[in-house]
C-alpha cells in the first residue's frame, strides 16, 4: 500500500505557531473557545459557540445618529430561528435612528457581523452580542450609514495611495462620585496618578478587562490631568488608549468601549461623562485620534528614522481640512469651550514633533539608537527590536461628542487629500512649528496660523465650504453632509463663547445639557 505524505513547509509551521501564540492570551472568550482569530468567524462558528456555552440570548447592536449603540434582543427559540436571525438579520425603523431618513419609507435591515461577537459582561442571562451593518430595502449597504461611510473612506484612500489607513483612539472620560475627603489629589495634576490619590484606578482596569474581552485592542490606561473637587464631589479624568488597527475596527472598539464604561459606571453608581467640557477652567475630555499608513504590513510613517514624505502629505491634508473636520469631531457648543488656550487642547492649524500645543502632534517614536531595555536590565541580551511600527501622528481637536465613524472617515479623507495636492509637502513645511505657540514670546508665530472654528455654526461654515472634498468618490453622501450642517447650525452659538464669558451659571447649564453627549 502506498501512502502520500503531505509536505508541511517550515513557513506553514512558523505561521501556525505565530497564530497560536497570538491566540493563547486573547481575552475574548469567543476567540479562546473557537481557537481562531475573530476575523475568521463564520456563522457556523457563532452557532457552535452559542450551543456549546448555553447562550440564552443574542443581542444585535448598532450605532445610530446620536453616536450611541442601540440594542435589539433575541431569545433563542430554536436552532432554525437562530440560523434565520444570523443569516437574514432583522428590520428596524430607520427614521427613529437617523434624522435624515423619512418616516414614510424608513425600514432598514440590520445584519450581524460575526467577527464582532463578544460575551456580554453585564447581562444576567448568558448573552452573545454582535455589531451590525445597515442595509436598505434593496439589500444594499445604507449609503449614509456612518460605518459604511468609513468603509468607503478607507477604500478611497486605498485606491488613491495603494496603502491602508489605520487608526486608534485615546478615550478620555470623567468619573464623578462623592468625595470621601481622604488622600485628596492635587487640582489639575492628576496625570498618571496612583491610588490612593487616584480614586478610580480599579474601575478603569475593570473597564479595560471588559473592553478587551469584547475584542478591543488596548495599549494602556491611566488617570489624566483633570482632577478636582466641586460641591462635595470628586471629578477624576481617566484615559484608555488603544492600539492601531484598521480604521473600521478602531471605530468599532471605541463604540463598544464607551458602552462598557457607561454600563460599569451605572453598575457602581458612578456618573461617567465623555463631554468635552464639564466646568470652567478645568481640562475637558478629548478624543485624540492617532493614525498610521501601512503598506504590505509595514508602517510607512518613517523613512530612515525620520518622518516620511508619505506622513507629511497626510499631515498636509489634515492641515487643509482641519476646520471642517471639527464638524465631525466637535459637534456641540461645549466642544468650543474646550478648544481654548492652556486647556490641553489645540486652537490653531499647525503641527509639530512632541508638541502638545499643536493640532497634529508627531509623538515620540522610539527612534533612539540605544538599547534601553538592556540599559535598564543589564542581564538582557543585546537584541534588535523593530520599533518603526509604533510611529503615528495624532489629531488632537476631536472630543467625546464625535460620531467616531464620521470622524475617522473625515480623517481618512483628509489624509487622502494630502496625496491629491501638488503642493502637499510645501503646506506641511509652512504649518510646522517647534515652539509652544501659546507662550508670549511666540505671539507672532501664533498670529500667522489659521484658527480652528470657535462655534458649531463656524464649523458648519467650514464644512459647507469644503464639502465637495468629502463627497468625492462617493464617500460622504450629500444627505449626511446636509444633516450635519443642519444639526450644527441649529445651536445658534456663533457668539456663545463671548455671550457667557464670566457667567459660570450659564456655563454649567450648557454642561448639564450636553453631559451625556456621544
Where in the sequence are the language-model features?
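ATP/Mg2+-dependent ligation/transfer catalytic cores
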Residues: 8-228, 245-259, 270, 406-407, ...
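Short hydrophobic/aromatic-rich motifs at helix boundaries and adjacent loops
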Residues: 16-19, 179-180, 230-235, 380, ...
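Short acidic (Asp/Glu) and glycine-rich catalytic loops that position anionic groups and cofactors
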Residues: 25-29, 185-187, 290-299, 384-391, ...
Amino acid at each position: 500500500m502506498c501512502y502520500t505524505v503531505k509536505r508541511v513547509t517550515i513557513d506553514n509551521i512558523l505561521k501556525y505557531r505565530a497564530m497560536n501564540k497570538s491566540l493563547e492570551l486573547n481575552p475574548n472568550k469567543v476567540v479562546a473557545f473557537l481557537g481562531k482569530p475573530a476575523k475568521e468567524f463564520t456563522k457556523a462558528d457563532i452557532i457552535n459557540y452559542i450551543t456549546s456555552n448555553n447562550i440564552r440570548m443574542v443581542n444585535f447592536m448598532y450605532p445610530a445618529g446620536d453616536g450611541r449603540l442601540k440594542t435589539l434582543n433575541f431569545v433563542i427559540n430554536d436552532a432554525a430561528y437562530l440560523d434565520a436571525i444570523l443569516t437574514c438579520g432583522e428590520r428596524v425603523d430607520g427614521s427613529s435612528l437617523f434624522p435624515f431618513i423619512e418616516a414614510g419609507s424608513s425600514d432598514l435591515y440590520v445584519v450581524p457581523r460575526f467577527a464582532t461577537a463578544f460575551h456580554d459582561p453585564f447581562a444576567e442571562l448568558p448573552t452573545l452580542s454582535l455589531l451590525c451593518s445597515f442595509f436598505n430595502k434593496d439589500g444594499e449597504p445604507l449609503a449614509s450609514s456612518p460605518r459604511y461611510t468609513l468603509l468607503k473612506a478607507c477604500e478611497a484612500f486605498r485606491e488613491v495611495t495603494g496603502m491602508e489607513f489605520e487608526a486608534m483612539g485615546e478615550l478620555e472620560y470623567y468619573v464623578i462620585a462623592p468625595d470621601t475627603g481622604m488622600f485628596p489629589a492635587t487640582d489639575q495634576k492628576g496625570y498618571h496618578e496612583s491610588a490612593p490619590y487616584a480614586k478610580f484606578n480599579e474601575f478603569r482596569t475593570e473597564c479595560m478587562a471588559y473592553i478587551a474581552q469584547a475584542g478591543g485592542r488596548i495599549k494602556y490606561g491611566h488617570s489624566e490631568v483633570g482632577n478636582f473637587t466641586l460641591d462635595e464631589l470628586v471629578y477624576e479624568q481617566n484615559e484608555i488608549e488603544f492600539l492601531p488597527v484598521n480604521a473600521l475596527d478602531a471605530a468599532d472598539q471605541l463604540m463598544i468601549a464607551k458602552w462598557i464604561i457607561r454600563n460599569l459606571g451605572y453598575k457602581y453608581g458612578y456618573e461617567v461623562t465623555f463631554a468635552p467640557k464639564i466646568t470652567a477652567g478645568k481640562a475637558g475630555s478629548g478624543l485624540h485620534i492617532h493614525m498610521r499608513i501601512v503598506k504590505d504590513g509595514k508602517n510607512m510613517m518613517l523613512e530612515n528614522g525620520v518622518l516620511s514624505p508619505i506622513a507629511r502629505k497626510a499631515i498636509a491634508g489634515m492641515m487643509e481640512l482641519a476646520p471642517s473636520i471639527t464638524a465631525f469631531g466637535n459637534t456641540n457648543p461645549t466642544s468650543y469651550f474646550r478648544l481654548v488656550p492652556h486647556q490641553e487642547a489645540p486652537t490653531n492649524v499647525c503641527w509639530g514633533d512632541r508638541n502638545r500645543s499643536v493640532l497634529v502632534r508627531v509623538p515620540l517614536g522610539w527612534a533612539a539608537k540605544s538599547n534601553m531595555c538592556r540599559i535598564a536590565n543589564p542581564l538582557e541580551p543585546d537584541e534588535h527590536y523593530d520599533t518603526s511600527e509604533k510611529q503615528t501622528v495624532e489629531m488632537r481637536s476631536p472630543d467625546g461628542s464625535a460620531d467616531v465613524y464620521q470622524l475617522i472617515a473625515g480623517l481618512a479623507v483628509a489624509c487622502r487629500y494630502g496625496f491629491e495636492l501638488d503642493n502637499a509637502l510645501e503646506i506641511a513645511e509652512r504649518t510646522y512649528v517647534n515652539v509652544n505657540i501659546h507662550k508670549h514670546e511666540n505671539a507672532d508665530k501664533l498670529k500667522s496660523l489659521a484658527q480652528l472654528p470657535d462655534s458649531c455654526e463656524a464649523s458648519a461654515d467650514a464644512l459647507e465650504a469644503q464639502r465637495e472634498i468629502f463627497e468625492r468618490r462617493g464617500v460622504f453622501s450629500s444627505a449626511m453632509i446636509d444633516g450635519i450642517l443642519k444639526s450644527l447650525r441649529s445651536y445658534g452659538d456663533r457668539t456663545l463663547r463671548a455671550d457667557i464669558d464670566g457667567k459660570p451659571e450659564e456655563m454649567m447649564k450648557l454642561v448639564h445639557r450636553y453631559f451625556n453627549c456621544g
